Regions:
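Class I SAM-dependent methyltransferase SAM/SAH-binding core
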Residues: 136-172
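N-terminal auxiliary segments of SAM/dcSAM-dependent transferases
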Residues: 1-76
């Protein structure tokens, strides 16, 4: 059974010591509460797993066991990325992450034998989708201890050592290990130096590999630098134009750069649920004009950009 302190064996020079340093109460005051939730999960034997739009594990169990599973997993609230289903328990997450995957899966194609890095991976949902597409292994990193622990709760049912979620920040990674596919989904606009983030994405991509960047964008020609909050988020430094995203990817070294999707985010895709009870997108939009945020900026639109590393 995979546990919190399991680490990949093929990441030389990575700061893997940080895993044990961060999986402790002194690093995050809620750690023991979250860990006890995972440890309280019944030792139910999961059946076959399906890595589709909903990540599923067949879990034959009685109603009492199912209720215990639900109570334990709800102690790991909020659940952002998904959906997941364990037996008859459906985890309706804030994001319909399957919609985002659908927008890029044709461009990604067959990932057979590829190693994938997912920066800002959350609980690892996209890692399961990459495995479905044939990936050999997925390494996800996310600074949120809660999201990492959610992943290990999921692993209690899936128990698949090909998908990792580690509590490491992107800027802490050396360039000594490179990947066939690097993903950065929903990270760029939180970076004070967006070009530097894309340069790191490039450095972590193998020659012949691809980088995929998903970010908030504006459809205007000029990038947006919010003053104060954007859609209630206080750490959005730049919402680039699509042209700016392409230019940054090219400056970082990627070629054959293209925008493969541009889609406005709607409250059908991002919303409050039983598993994410905080406010969500609908509370961030102008009540009288949903094409604007409550601060008066253009409402969220997201683009997916892909480029190749040829040298």
């Amino acid at each position: 059974m995979i546990d919190l302190y399991d680490i990949p064996k093929n990441l030389p020079d990575w700061p893997l010591h940080l895993i044990k340093e961060r999986f402790r109460q002194s690093y995050h005051g809620d750690f023991e509460r979250w860990r006890s939730a995972v440890e309280s999960l019944p030792k139910a034997v999961a059946g076959p797993c399906i890595y589709g739009d909903t990540i599923r594990a067949e879990m034959p169990c009685d109603e009492k066991t199912l209720n215990a599973v639900k109570l334990a997993l709800q102690r790991l609230h909020p659940w952002r990325k998904g959906p997941f289903c364990f037996g008859d328990l459906h985890i309706d997450t804030e994001w319909r992450s399957d919609w985002k995957w659908r927008r890029m899966q044709h461009a990604l194609g067959d990932l057979s034998g590829q190693r994938v890095l997912d920066i800002g991976c959350g609980n690892g949902y996209f890692g399961w989708r990459a495995l479905q597409a044939g990936a050999y292994e997925v390494v996800g990193i996310d600074p949120s201890i809660l999201f990492c622990i959610q992943h290990y709760a999921i692993q209690r049912f899936l128990n698949d050592g090909r998908n990792w979620v580690l509590p490491i920040k992107g800027e802490e990674l050396p360039g000594s290990v490179q990947f066939d596919l690097t993903l950065s989904m929903g990270v760029l606009y939180h970076r004070r130096e967006p070009l530097q983030h894309i340069q790191q994405l490039f450095a972590l991509t193998k020659v012949g590999g691809r980088g995929v960047l998903e970010t908030l964008v504006v459809t205007d020609a000029k990038s947006l630098y919010p003053s104060g909050r954007y859609a209630r988020m206080g750490n959005v430094w730049c919402v680039p134009s699509t042209a700016q995203v392409v230019q940054w990817m090219q400056q970082a070294g990627f070629d054959q750069v293209e925008i493969i999707d541009v889609t406005a985010t709607t409250p059908d895709e991002q919303r409050s649920t039983e598993w994410m009870r905080f406010g969500s997108l609908s509370g961030c939009l102008d009540a009288h004009d949903p094409s604007r945020t409550i601060e008066g900026y253009p409402a969220p639109v997201r683009a997916i950009c892909m480029g190749f590393r040829s040298s």
